[in-house]
Curated annotation (Swiss-Prot):
Residues 561-564 are annotated as: G3. One of the essential components for the initiation of protein synthesis. Protects formylmethionyl-tRNA from spontaneous hydrolysis and promotes its binding to the 30S ribosomal subunits. Also involved in the hydrolysis of GTP during the formation of the 70S ribosomal complex. The gene is infB. The keyword GTP-binding applies. This is Translation initiation factor IF-2. It comes from Microcystis aeruginosa (strain NIES-843 / IAM M-2473). InterPro entries: EF-G-like_DII (IPR053905), IF2_II (IPR044145), IF2_N (IPR006847), P-loop_NTPase (IPR027417), Small_GTP-bd (IPR005225), T_Tr_GTP-bd_dom (IPR000795), TF_IF2_bacterial-like (IPR000178), TIF_IF2 (IPR015760). GTP binds at residues 511-518, 561-565, 615-618. Residues 502-675 form the tr-type G domain.
Length: 1010
């Protein structure tokens, strides 16, 4: 046995005691050890077990006698001795329990059942909830306890402080569930001690038992305790030995406080579970709490020191840590540091005050506080200012750090300037500053030094933006504009692949103006469309289908005729985007022209095959080989020259070789494998749109996939409609339109924009919601474009208007179709507007109405109509209001007249007009002055006109010709080849050989300068 070694902590587990308890016993027996992990001999272990067993036996005997003979005065005296424990709430709870135990035997079992749950609360805060749940069964006991509590103070007059203490602990437990957050720290306890007036025996018992069970565990911290708190506890009683026992229980309290630390909960729970086992055993005897007290009594004095100090130590350690942190923070922020020091001083004073109060009120206050969860909201605590001080400190630290985050947030704002920016159009000063990461003030200052006064909302053009960017060393990139002919939407979905069928090809006829596109189409259709076009030029897209035979089978080809005039670029691009094959018409006598090149670029952008029709080969001046050469320069090499481009010479007027052209078109269509799914909802493109005075909004749609039917809910761009009727290219009503066919539909709510794509939806509600959403987006885009297109701000506009520098021509534009409106607006933008700006107040398809006239009268605008009519009453209203209405059917004349109107707004300029030359051949002195005898070499001399006297290369005089005489008679003018006398009142220094140049200043109408 002597060789066997036992570790102290193993022994403590075996005895269900704390390591400190075992170490105390080792001190009493003079057993050497270093720590709780030291080993001792088996003999020493047996000695320790014996002493521990004696301590348990004595405590149990005392408690059992105290409970059974509570009525005898002798036993009461023993309880008075124990009453010193009453400083500790656990003991008062015990006495309270003894009385109810006598009152009714039936209450005892109920007493035993509640004590077990209370043990768990000691381990961790969640345990209390369980205890609180089990407390209700002891309601009867609570009623019986209340009188017993009153008896206790009367029976124990020897202990003046004990009596109030006994009352306080029960009240404290009763309040525990509510103030549970408050009691996380030991400070709030003094308040609760004064407050208790209710007697919650069951909860008090739980508190006492928990404390007694945890009594051994606090020994760990007791060794660190300072003697200050024990002395405070001794002062109230004056009996140091008796106070030892309460101190023991205080240790318990300290142990309970451990759960406050996040790192220790696991260990504490383990020890508390062991302690619960011991309490359960003692509870069966009915001497549960007395047993613990006996153990505590053995180590009384030491334990008094231990319990009191641990809370102090915990506070002090945290306070010291906070002080160190404050000192560090003070280095960075002096002001914040001063505030923290003040709060620290308050904290220290409150700490001392709280420790004194805890000593006067008795250690049980610490017990209750330590048993409760940590970090309570101490807002309710009136006497102790400590919690408040701590709270003040904590926020102060963050505030010290808050400065840094602000600076960090400000730093990223200073973003690096980009090396290059992408500019697609005009930008406001604010938008440019965001793009360049440069303050607006810098941009405004830069422009101001360059002589341009701008404000933050003013729009800058691309040239100005490039100039500003150069000053800030930023490159400006202008992205290449995407061709409008590029096909952006794939009309065939994956779901259509299983149901695809062949469809007719859509062929677009393109070429330069007057090269015979519409005549060629007329010859193919055997109609006379070209004769109906104003001026013989096509002014909007026409869609027609032609039935032809190919390989003995009937085939169909859908033709789109596009305008060739330069103003209709958008229409040509739109035609190329929806087409399958492009037929390029080139006049054999004219060659490749600008619109021919443009048509080639559109077809290439749309990635469609090109078939060239060389027209007018019947003319004597036709030279097809020259055309092929010019097309080769554009990258189109004829097949007979070794290329891949099909070129067919035709005569549209005579209808020569048209069958060959159609054959080539169908061959190309076969190679392209054009397919669509007719068994689905239709989708396609708006070819043209207009507002008809009788039909309302009308749109020409090209169905590219699916089948369009009457009654379908359609969304074209941002316009909703339900198809009421469909009309084909020959004026016949149809019920359905299959892929590749163009139809005119009625039933739209508004005029859609040409080029918009349309979709058919099953649900009218869904279609309406999509249309509304798109309308909002389009409105916002339009407003943004209107703002960005402002060339001047309102401030500069008013200044220029006052000074007469700004001229504006207000226009209201009405046309037959949407495409014509686009073309006219595009052409107007090409006019120079440096001195006169064009403001289009309204541009829409439809007839000219009285509303348009009223708008023109209010704004001083000119109403321009193109291929449209006047509504009833519009002409009379215009005459009454004095509004000028101009109607055109050829775009050339429209543009010429608008340019003339713009020039008419310009102030006429004074121009020098040459009159003639004369040579001085003699000088005559007349009175004080001199007169020059001259010979008119060219032109004429006119009196009261301007003249210059040139002597060699110098101009000697410049003034007015005052006197002109011929043969001593005044003459108004002298023509070439005649002699005359010239007199000038302010010039007499004539010399022979001088040249007189006569001129006059005339007012001349200005032209627009680009």
């Amino acid at each position: 046995m002597s060789n066997t070694k036992v570790r102290i902590y193993d022994l403590s587990k075996e005895l269900n005691l704390d390591n400190k308890d075992i170490l105390d016993i080792c001190d009493q027996l003079n057993i050497e050890y270093k720590s709780h992990s030291s080993t001792i001999s088996e003999e020493d272990a047996q000695r320790i077990k014996a002493i521990a067993a004696k301590g348990l036996a004595s405590s149990t005997s005392k408690n059992s006698t105290g409970q059974r003979e509570s009525a005898s005065p002798a036993e009461e005296k023993k309880q008075k001795i124990l009453a010193l424990h009453k400083h500790n709430r656990p003991e008062t709870g015990e006495e309270g329990e003894s009385y109810p135990g006598q009152a009714g035997s039936s209450a005892k079992p109920t007493l035993i059942s509640p004590p077990r749950p209370p043990v768990k609360p000691l381990v961790a805060p969640p345990g209390r909830d369980e205890a609180a749940e089990k407390t209700p069964p002891t309601a009867a006991e609570m009623l019986s306890h209340s009188p017993s509590v009153k008896e206790t103070p009367t029976e124990t007059p020897l202990v003046p402080e004990a009596a109030p203490t006994l009352i306080a602990p029960p009240n404290r437990p009763s309040l525990t569930p509510k103030p549970r957050p408050e009691t996380a720290s030991g400070r709030p306890e003094p308040r609760s001690k004064n407050a208790p007036g209710s007697n919650d025996r069951p909860r008090g018992e739980k508190r006492e038992r928990g404390e007694s069970e945890n009594a051994p565990s606090p020994e760990r911290r007791v060794g660190l305790a300072k003697p200050e708190k024990p002395t405070l506890n001794r002062k109230p009683d004056g009996k140091s030995p008796k106070l030892a026992e309460p101190a023991r229980e205080v240790r318990e309290t300290v142990e309970l406080k451990r759960p406050v630390r996040p790192g220790l909960p696991a260990k504490i729970s383990a020890t508390s579970e062991e302690e619960t086992d011991t309490t359960k055993k003692s509870g069966v005897d009915g001497t549960e709490i007395d047993t613990d007290t006996g153990l505590l009594g053995a180590d009384g004095p030491k334990k008094l020191k231990r319990p009191t100090m641990p809370p102090r130590m915990a506070k002090k350690s945290t306070w010291e840590e906070e002080e160190e942190e404050e000192k560090k923070a003070a280095k960075t922020a002096k002001t914040a540091g001063k505030n923290k020091r003040r709060t620290q001083a308050l904290f220290e004073d409150d700490d001392d005050l709280e420790s004194e109060l805890s000593g006067l009120i008795n250690t049980p206050s610490f017990t209750l506080s330590t048993a409760r969860p940590p970090k309570p909201p101490t807002a309710k605590a009136a006497p102790p200012g400590t919690p408040t001080a701590v709270k003040v400190k904590r926020p102060s630290k963050p505030t010290a750090h808050t400065g840094s985050p602000k600076s960090e947030r400000q730093e990223p704002q200073e973003e690096k300037r980009p090396e290059s920016i992408v500019v697609t159009g005009s930008l406001t000063v604010r938008d440019l500053s965001e793009l360049m990461k440069v303050p607006e003030t810098e941009i405004i200052r830069t422009l101001f030094f360059k002589g341009m006064a701008v404000n933050i909302t003013q729009t800058l053009d691309v040239d100005t933006i490039e100039m500003i960017a150069r000053d800030f060393e930023i490159a400006v990139e202008t992205p290449s504009t995407q061709s409008a002919a590029i096909k952006t939407t794939e009309m065939i979905d994956v779901s259509d692949w299983e149901s695809l069928q062949r469809r007719p090809p859509v062929v677009t006829i393109m070429g330069h103006v007057d090269h015979g596109k519409t005549t060629l189409l007329d010859s193919i259709r055997k109609t006379k469309v070209a004769q109906g076009e104003a001026g013989g030029i096509t002014q909007h897209i026409g869609a027609y289908h032609v039935d032809v035979e190919h390989n003995g089978k009937p085939e169909q080809i859908v033709f789109l005729d596009t305008p060739g005039h330069e103003a209709f670029t958008a229409m040509r691009a739109r035609g190329a985007r929806v087409t399958d094959i492009a037929v390029l018409v080139v006049a054999a006598d004219d060659g490749v022209q600008p619109q021919t090149k443009e048509a080639i670029s559109h077809a290439r952008a749309a990635e469609v095959p090109i078939v060239v029709a060389i027209n007018k080969v019947d003319k004597p001046s036709a030279n097809p080989d020259r055309i092929k050469q010019e097309l080769t320069e554009q990258g189109l090499v004829a097949e007979d020259w070794g290329g891949e481009t099909i070129m067919v010479p035709v005569s549209a007027l005579r209808g020569e070789n048209l069958d060959n052209l159609l054959e080539m078109i169908l061959l190309v269509a076969e190679v392209e494998e054009l397919v669509a799914n007719p068994d689905r909802l239709a989708k396609g493109t708006v070819i043209e749109a207009n507002l008809d005075r009788t039909k309302g909004p009308v749109a020409t749609l090209l169905v590219q996939n699916g089948t369009l039917r009457v009654g379908d809910s359609i969304v074209a761009g941002s316009v909703f409609g339900k198809i009421r009727a469909m009309i084909d290219d020959r004026g016949q009503k149809v019920e359905a339109a299959t892929p590749s066919f163009a139809v005119e539909i009625l039933g739209l709510s508004d005029v859609p924009a040409a080029g918009d794509e349309f979709d058919v939806y099953e649900s009218e509600k869904e279609a309406r919601s999509i249309a509304d959403q798109r309308a909002i987006e389009r409105r916002n885009t339009r407003l943004q474009q209107a703002l960005s297109s402002r060339r001047v701000s309102l401030s500069t506009l008013s200044i220029q208007a006052q000074e007469g520098q700004l001229k504006e021509l207000n226009l209201i534009l009405k046309a037959d179709v949407q495409g014509s409106v686009e073309a006219i607006l595009g052409a107007l933008k090409q006019l120079p507007q440096n001195e006169v700006q064009i403001r289009v107040l309204l541009a829409s398809p439809g007839e000219i109405t009285e509303t348009d006239v009223d708008l023109a009268a209010a704004s001083g605008a000119v109403v321009v109509g193109f291929n449209t009519t006047l509504a009833s009453g519009a002409r009379a209203s215009a005459d009454r209001e004095g509004v000028d209405i101009r109607d055109y059917n050829i775009i050339y004349k429209l543009l010429d007249d608008i340019q003339g109107a713009m020039e008419g707004l310009l102030d006429p300029e004074e121009v020098e007009e040459h009159l003639g030359f004369a040579e001085v051949r003699a000088v005559f002195t007349v009175g004080r002055g001199a007169v020059a005898g001259c010979y008119v070499q060219s032109g004429k001399l006119v009196r009261n006109r301007f003249l210059r006297v040139r002597r060699g290369k110098e101009i000697v005089y410049q003034g007015v010709l005052d006197s002109l005489k011929r043969m001593k008679e005044d003459a108004r003018e002298v023509a070439t080849g005649f002699e005359c006398g010239v007199g000038v009142s302010k010039f007499n220094d004539w010399k022979e050989g001088d040249i007189i140049e006569a001129y006059e200043m005339v007012m001349k109408r200005r032209t627009l300068s680009s």
